[in-house]
Amino acid sequence: MIDFDGYRPNVGIVICNKAGQVLWAKRFGQNSWQFPQGGINEGENIETAMYRELYEEVGLTKKDVRLLWASKYWLKYKLPKRLVRSDGSQLVCIGQKQRWFLLQLLSDENLIDLKTTKSPEFDGWRWVSFWYPVRQVVSFKRDVYRKVMKEFAGVLLNESKKPETVEKPRVERTEKRDFQKRDNQKREFRKSARMWNNSHQKGKAQ
């Protein structure tokens, strides 16, 4: 499917592990590496397309990951002239427009499978540092990768700073009330003692 501007709607997927590294995949039969990505079918929901591509390209399902973020806007890149092609109609694909997703791997990495289809996209993968792909991806995708990773970096930073929610034990509030009660009792006792002492001294004087 190609839009009237010549761009093919596409989803891109960044998968991170708990160490903050990202999954970097090698294109089948090539010395070219990239993030998983794939086209959106006509009438297909963007998120549905993402989970479909996730399974087709790396063998993971929705239960294996946690969706951390989805880019709000389309990001475009143009293809080099040698890669420009027609879809069989009068429309010519001049590039991709992409919506990107940041996922955190929850399952064991051994579940990653590059051979779920008869025509796999990748024949190898590895974990790399977060910014590594921006420097290593093919030049015509580099600007999109830079924007995506800049947006996702803020998301991961916020994730790492999230404190664990710990409810203050109810006993602490109870103890605080008990201390206040004892303080009030002490003040009342001292007040009564002074009144009794004054009254006793007056009785002696009489």
From Swiss-Prot:
GO cellular component, one term: cytoplasm
Cofactor names: a divalent metal cation
GO BP annotations, alphabetical order: mRNA catabolic process
Nudix hydrolase domain residues: 6-150
Listed SUPFAM superfamilies: Nudix (SSF55811)
InterPro entries the UniProt entry points to: Nudix_hydrolase, NUDIX_hydrolase-like_dom_sf, NUDIX_hydrolase_CS, NUDIX_hydrolase_dom, RppH
Enzyme class: hydrolase
Keyword Transferase belongs to the record: no
Disordered: annotated segments: 162-206
EC number in record: 3.6.1.-
Any one GO molecular function term: mRNA 5'-diphosphatase activity
Keywords from the named record: Hydrolase
Bias (Basic and acidic residues): 162-191
Protein name: RNA pyrophosphohydrolase
Native source organism of the sequence: Actinobacillus pleuropneumoniae serotype 5b (strain L20)
Gene it is expressed from: rppH
